[in-house]
């Protein structure tokens, strides 16, 4: 079994032998422009997501009472998660493509911080859905787009503790 010192030595040797990304044939690299054409477009998408999350939180937090609101909310939530995933992929793939790129590392770290904050703002949604009456969720389940999600939510709901029990 290798010691920590041996692993560190192996890693240093491996990293010394790595070629620079600029030396790699462009046909062997990821083209991240399919996600965002430019850094500016990426930054605009991140700002757009921040605004959409704020609006979503204002519109839905403490306001979901009907099956229609559940369905519209879930459609919006899916779109937010899709945009979030694209932003996250762009940052993480840029770092994976070139681990020596300090700019990409900084952008990824800053973006992860922003996304964590947005995730916290969105966390109310699934929690509030799980607190809805089963009849409302069953009605919302009629929407094919939401059926599987709501089916799982109803199943998970059986195992949730009440707010009073959670508080103790």
Language model features: what each stretch is:
Residues 5-168:
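A well-structured
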